[in-house]
Regions:
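Vicinal oxygen chelate
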Residues: 1-4, 23, 29, 31-32, 38, 52-123
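A short, acidic/glycine-rich surface segment
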Residues: 46-52, 121-123
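A generic structural signal for ordered alpha-helices
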Residues: 8, 42, 52-55, 59, ...
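N-terminal beta-strand motif that seeds the catalytic metal site of vicinal oxygen chelate
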Residues: 1-11, 16, 61-66, 116-123
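Short linear motifs in intrinsically disordered
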Residues: 16-21, 69, 92-94
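Short amphipathic alpha-helices in soluble, non-transmembrane regions
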Residues: 11-15, 77-82
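Core segments of cupin and vicinal oxygen chelate
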Residues: 1-47
Length: 123
């Protein structure tokens, strides 16, 4: 992910449970428990490495979703992110596909989804 503000981006993703070290330069990466690696590069570094690089335009430049431990955790995570000063795109709702869902916006205007499976209704 290319970021305009490394420290603010790290602060946001820590609220979502990403265990990431404090940034010390223009590149940072974190390995999630599943083995997926998230990597950040400062906008200044990218412009230095690729002078012709242009920032992507439009909505949903990346697709990133974090699974929460429960429907209540979706609500709590959304509230924690918003309370920390970040924006909500859409507050928690029960989606027709069987998940509790919410959308928040990271410091670089990427929409990040939060979700958890809803309990299966009993007859």
């Amino acid at each position: 992910m290319v970021t305009k503000d490394m420290k603010e981006s790290v602060r946001f993703y820590r609220l979502l449970g990403v265990d990431v070290t404090d940034p010390v330069d223009d590149h940072l990466d974190a390995t999630l428990p599943s083995g997926v690696r998230l990597m950040w590069d400062a906008l200044e570094l990218i412009k230095q490495l690729e002078p012709d690089w242009e920032e992507p335009r439009g909505h949903r430049r990346i697709g990133l979703a974090f699974e929460c431990s429960s429907p209540g955790d979706v609500d709590a995570t959304h509230a924690r992110v918003v309370k920390a000063g970040f924006r909500s795109k859409k507050g928690p709702w029960d989606a027709f596909w069987g998940q509790r869902y919410a959308e928040v916006i990271d410091p670089d205007d990427n929409v990040v989804d939060l979700f958890a499976e809803l309990p299966t209704p009993t007859a």
